[in-house]
């Protein structure tokens, strides 16, 4: 309905869809299930398989922490445990703990900043959002991940979505271990589309 509304409002027959990280799950399902008004898809930080994604991301964080002799990080990862069916025991807390360690060792980007310095602090300093907006974003993010992640982690695109009626493009970081690049190449190879490209 939203795509049809936007096409009418913008007086366009078709729109391009862009998804980043979790948005690649939404975008891929949208393009696969409702291709009529989609001109093309562009994804970055492409999700491929929710369960394998989390397992590989956890393993990367654990391996890097062990190599660095970071006993505190290893202990944290052992405490939260390897994800089961793509989810940590304490969904939000476990995921955030793993993501902090994964990011610390360059698994999110080559910038080894923290979520605090790279995400939270710039948001807090932003003049574009009110205090209420910022609080709502933080609480909404936590609530959203806590309740939606068990469903989100069930996606398996190589099994569910490989044939597309529109061009399908992926921009992926070669060192990405948040949405592991190790899964992306095999998925890309399986995709059938009028045009496709994987840009590293």
Which residues are covered by each model-predicted region?
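Conserved acidic catalytic loop of the alpha/beta-hydrolase fold
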Residues: 2-14
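Active-site signature of alpha/beta-hydrolase-fold catalytic machinery across serine-
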Residues: 5, 29-33, 186
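Conserved alpha/beta-hydrolase "nucleophile elbow" surrounding the catalytic nucleophile
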Residues: 15, 19-24, 173
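A catalytic-pocket lid/entrance helix-loop region that shapes and gates access to the active site
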Residues: 25-84
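Alpha/beta-hydrolase
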Residues: 62-159, 166
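Short beta-strand/loop motif that positions the catalytic acidic residue
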Residues: 164, 170-172, 176
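Conserved alpha/beta-hydrolase "acid-adjacent" motif
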Residues: 177-183
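Catalytic histidine neighborhood in serine/cysteine hydrolases
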Residues: 189-200
